[in-house]
Amino acid sequence: MMLQKLLIFLKENSAKILIKYDGERDIKKYTVRLLYSDIKCRSLGSDTDLPCAILKEIFVENEFVGVEEILDFYNSTISYGIEILKNQFGGGSVISIVIAEKDGAILYTIHIQNTNGTRCLTGVDYIELYENLLLEKI
């Protein structure tokens, strides 16, 4: 149900969520943004060391019902996946996650870049994507 609300929110706002970990930075290692498809709309979010706070700010500002559920999803799934990928590919990696709506489903894109190369996977199952990335070497 919670992801259904997120799906509707993204579709109605023609928006995507970007969560990026940049291990090359010394501070504010995360970027969290709500990106609108309409380039006339300003994106919301910022660079931070506290991604949950920025996510909460974005959803509260947009009067999203179910903010706590989104934060739980971030903490239990997205953040967990980022930590595992950091351990696999190195803390200096850049890991980007884009969450978007496409054809009535939530679509995840995970992009990893480190000194050895880059890798990008897209699909509807976030956990399956990051598990597949763990099997690969870049």
Feature-to-residue mapping (PLM):
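Negatively charged, low-complexity tracts enriched in Asp/Glu with abundant Ser/Thr
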Residues: 1-16, 55, 59-95, 117
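Generic detector of low-complexity/intrinsically disordered segments
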Residues: 12, 36-37, 87, 135-137
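Short aromatic-glycine-(Arg/Gly/Cys) micro-motifs in beta-strand/loop hairpins
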Residues: 21-42, 100-117
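Polar low-complexity intrinsically disordered regions enriched in Ser/Thr and small residues
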Residues: 26, 84, 93-95, 107, ...
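A short, exposed loop/beta-hairpin motif centered on an aromatic-Gly-Thr core
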Residues: 39-52, 114-128
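Generic low-polarity alpha-helical segments
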Residues: 48, 79-83, 129-130
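Repeat-associated, polar segments at repeat-unit boundaries in modular proteins
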Residues: 50-68, 122-138
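Compositionally biased, intrinsically disordered low-complexity segments enriched
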Residues: 90, 113-115, 138
